[in-house]
Each structure stands twice: as C-alpha cells, then as structure tokens.
C-alpha cells in the first residue's frame, strides 16, 4: 500500500501499521486494487493525513465511506476533485456554510483548502469498490481510524469535533468534551439535513471556539 502520509502522523501511527490486523488489511486492499475498480486511487488513500499534518490539526470531521461514483472520491471525506459536481451532502454542507457565515457557495467541491488550514476530513473506511457502497467495511479500516481518533483524543486538546449523524457521533465519543469542542448534528444527507443540520451553525461556532483559545479561525 502506498502510504503517503505526513511524517508526524506516520510516527504517531507507526505501531498501528505493524499490528496484524493492519497487515491483513493491507493485503486485502492490495488484492482489491489489483483485481477491481477501487476508489480513491491508491496514492490518495491517506490523503486526509497528508493534507492535514498532526501539528496543524484544529478540526476533525468524520465521514463514513468514500464516494463510490466515478471520479468522486479524492481521499478527504465529503470532498470531490475540481470540476466534479457536488454530491448532495456536500451541497448541503456548502449551503449551511453560506447561511451560517455569509460565505458564497464555492465553485469547487475540493476541500483541500479546509485540510490545509487544519481540518482532518476523515472517513471511517478509506477505500471502496466502484458503485458498491460500504464494500470495504469490516476489513480493518474502522479499527485503524478508531486508533486515529483515540490518538487525537489522547495527545491533543482544544480540538473541534464536528460529528454529523449517529455513526460519526459513536466514533467520536472518546473525545473529552471538557477539553475540546464537540459539535453534534444530524448527517448533511438530504434524508436528514432538514432535521437539524441546517441551522446548526457549526462553522461559526467552530471559529468562535478557535478564537477563544487564541487560534486562527478557519476560512470556510
């Protein structure tokens, strides 16, 4: 597996990479890439970490599964490459940013600009078969990303966790609300966004928290 990952993350997660489950996961993923159409491309599997080094981390957003449509997944949860139409959840995220902060809806769904400011856009499962949602669930990725969240919770404080939907909320439950800012809402999917994602004001609330602890706010 082409593990392109920021050096500080590599050091923090080095023991995880050596565990038997991760070796089995690596074998599975290599076999899948060799025999099937898998997203994102191999060099982007760990892109969320490469774009957001541990020492710059301010915000954690947890997704579930990469997009499984052609040309969509780029290694950051909810993000798509330049020129790719916005999936519905991303459209709703941008709508809430606009309503909350007054920022215009961007022309690109590429969230590199968030990651480079310290937003870890972490899917629970980092790979998927084309057109088969959750096809790589249950093979070890969840254990690995649980370890990521646990490392953040143990080594960092003053982190904002944006937990959208019950899956993300379970995964982020380890974070201490006394030492961090925990923002919860329903998932931005069209199935649920109108039940509390719209109007949650997570983006302005995140920036207020960052300013309160002397950190630069995110340009959403």
Give the ranges of each region predicted by the language model.
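Generic N-terminal amphipathic, Lys/Arg-enriched alpha-helix
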Residues: 1-13
């Amino acid at each position: 597996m082409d593990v392109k990952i920021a050096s500080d993350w590599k050091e923090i997660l080095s023991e995880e990479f050596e565990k038997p489950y991760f070796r089995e996961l690596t074998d599975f993923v290599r076999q899948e890439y060799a025999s099937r159409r898998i997203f994102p491309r191999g060099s982007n599997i760990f892109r969320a970490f490469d774009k957001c080094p541990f020492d710059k981390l301010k915000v954690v957003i947890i997704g579930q599964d990469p997009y499984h449509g052609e040309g969509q997944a780029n290694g950051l949860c909810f993000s798509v490459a330049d020129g790719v139409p916005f999936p519905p959840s991303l459209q709703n995220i941008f709508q809430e940013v606009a309503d909350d902060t007054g920022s215009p809806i961007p022309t690109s769904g590429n969230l590199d600009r968030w990651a480079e400011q310290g937003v870890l856009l972490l899917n629970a499962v980092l790979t998927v078969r084309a057109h088969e949602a959750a096809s790589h669930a249950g093979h070890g990725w969840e254990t690995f990303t649980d370890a990521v969240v646990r490392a953040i919770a143990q080594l960092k404080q003053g982190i904002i966790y944006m937990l959208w939907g019950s899956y993300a909320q379970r995964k982020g439950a380890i974070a201490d609300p006394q030492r961090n800012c925990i923002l919860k809402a329903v998932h931005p999917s069209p199935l649920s966004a109108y039940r509390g994602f719209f109007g949650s004001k997570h983006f302005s609330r995140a920036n207020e928290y960052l300013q309160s602890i002397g950190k630069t706010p995110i340009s959403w």
